[in-house]
Amino acid sequence: LTEADEWRKEVWEMIKLRPDITFWLQTKRAERVLDNLPSWWGDGLENVIMVFTTENQKRADERLPILLDLPFKHKGIMCAPMISEITLDQYLSTGKFEIVLVDGENYEGNRPLYFDWVKKIYDECVKYNIKFDFCGTGNVFIKDGKTYNIPKAYQRVMALKSELQNPLIYKEKDIKIQPRCKTCKRRF
C-alpha cells in the first residue's frame, strides 16, 4: 500500500537488524514488491520469507511467476481464500517454494472450499517434499458431495482432522474439540 511507503525504510532496517526473528511478508500486490525492496537487499535475507496469496488459478498464474523471479531466499504460497481449484505443479516443480498454505473463505464470505481442491494441492506438495498446511476449512466446506457450514471457531480444528499436513503434525485422534458456548462459540 502506498500509505506504508513513508515508514517502509524503517521497517526494512528493523528486519535487517533482527536476524534472530523470521519475518513473514505476505502480499497480493506482486507487482509492487521489487520496487519497494531496499537498495542493500541483494539476493535477500535468511530471516525473511515472501508469500504471495493466490485465490484462484488466474491469480496464481499472474503472481507466482513474479515471485519466482524476485530475490528472496525463502518463498511460499498462500491459497486463501481459495475460491476455485488451483494447480501449482509447474511452480512447485521449480524447487523454489518452501511452504504452501490453504484456507477457505471466512467472515462474511460464503464461497465454498472443496476438499478435493485441498487434497490436490496437498498431493502436489508431497510430490515435491514441500511443507503444506491446511489452515482452515472456511465457512462452507464440501467433502464427498456433502456441504458443511463450519463456524470460525472450528475451522482450524476440522482442517487438522483432515490430516492434510506435510509433515503431519497431529494425528486425527489426538485433536480434541474443546467445549464451546452454543451462542458465542467461546471456549469454556
PLM regions with names:
Residues L1-N36, W40-E85, F97-Y114:
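Core AdoMet radical
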Residues I83, D89-F188:
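Auxiliary Fe-S-binding modules of radical SAM enzymes
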